[in-house]
Amino acid sequence: MSEQTIRLTQYSHGAGCGCKISPKVLETILHSEQAKFVDPNLLVGNETRDDAAVYDLGNGTSVISTTDFFMPIVDNPFDFGRIAATNAISDIFAMGGKPIMAIAILGWPINTLAPEIAREVIEGGRFACQQAGIALAGGHSIDAPEPIFGLAVTGIVPTERVKRNSTAQPGCKLFLTKPLGIGVLTTAEKKSLLKPEHIGLATEVMCQMNLAGAAFANIDGVKAMTDVTGFGLLGHLSEVCQGAGVQAQIVYQEIPKLPGVEEYIAQGAVPGGTQRNFASYGHLMGEMPVEWRDLLCDPQTSGGLLLAVTPESETEVKATAAEFGITLTAIGELVTARGGRPMIEIR
């Protein structure tokens, strides 16, 4: 089988960040009765489900460490590698950091798919690393029943500039740097529903590097930041709210959306991860139309940054985003938690 005709998505049961283990199941897996080793220099661990771990070196600089990998979300091997690498590197930017090095993680069905195809995947990953200004310095591979690719990435950040997902404040406005609907469009393509004018749109968005995160770190008014990936906007927003003890009010019409996404939802192009996300986070949300839920719980692969910004810093954040070709519009705001109200209200 040639590299030109291969359809990688046929060789995996999941796709991109949509193949994440559901939050409810993950909570069971991570639960431990053992006493946890406490290291005072570990600034960010997994307590708030943040994007990466952060370790204070004690000299004003902290190290950021993350890993991310998944099964193919697109058929083209080079694009798969590029998307997976971009997605992994994003975790460093989401913490406000600068990536400095990456190593590859590769699982490959060597008796089913030619090694030349795996090489194309690696080349796509290397291309993304070059875009981020880092080397793909090595890696590890195994013979696996399904193709898997991703990176372990190391970054650095001034300790005082670390951006967490748990430090938002009431009054902050919410911004999203990429449109939603990646899971919907990739599902529509698998179902042969995708219109010609929408082919390649999801890949283009997934390949956009979240470089702006390192610049947002220099703005004091950016009180919290995370990237929106497999748990969807509402899943990752709920982590922001839970970490800070606040509630969110979202205006659906202000949320950036990929072209055609609502039409494809109406045609049933909803990935399986959407329902898993709703099953995990639905109890935290107010009433909304099903079609809104299907977009807001849509698992994103290499999605955008979600920012919580003080009103005083809104102009500076928008100007910084514009330097990276990003136009920002507030999609909602955070408010003081009130009893008897859902954590996230959509209107």
From Swiss-Prot:
**Task performed by this protein:** Synthesizes selenophosphate from selenide and ATP.
According to UniProt, the name of this protein is: Selenide, water dikinase
Q: Which gene encodes it?
A: selD
Subunit details for this protein? Answer: Homodimer.
Q: What Gene3D superfamilies does the record point to?
A: PurM-like C-terminal domain, PurM-like, N-terminal domain
What Gene Ontology terms describe what this protein does at the molecular function level? Answer: ATP binding; magnesium ion binding; selenide, water dikinase activity
Q: Which cofactor does it need?
A: Mg(2+)
Q: Which residues are involved in binding ATP?
A: K20, T48, R49, D50, D68, D91, G139, H140, S141
Query: What is the source species?
Result: Enterobacter sp. (strain 638)
The annotated site for Important for catalytic activity falls at K20
Q: GO CC terms on record?
A: cytoplasm
Note accompanying the cofactor annotation: Binds 1 Mg(2+) ion per monomer.
Keywords in alphabetical order: ATP-binding, Kinase, Magnesium, Metal-binding, Nucleotide-binding, Selenium, Transferase
Q: Tell me the GO BP annotations in alphabetical order.
A: selenocysteine biosynthetic process
Q: Which InterPro entries does the annotation name?
A: PurM-like_C_dom, PurM-like_C_sf, PurM-like_N, PurM-like_N_sf, SelD_I, SPS/SelD
Q: Which Pfam families match?
A: AIRS, AIRS_C
| Annotated Mg(2+) binding sites | D51, D91, D227
Source organism superkingdom: Bacteria
Q: What family is reported?
A: Belongs to the selenophosphate synthase 1 family. Class I subfamily.
Which Enzyme Commission number(s) are on file for it? 2.7.9.3
Q: Which reaction does it catalyse?
A: hydrogenselenide + ATP + H2O = selenophosphate + AMP + phosphate + 2 H(+)
> Which of the seven top EC classes does this enzyme belong to?
transferase
Q: Where is the active site?
A: C17
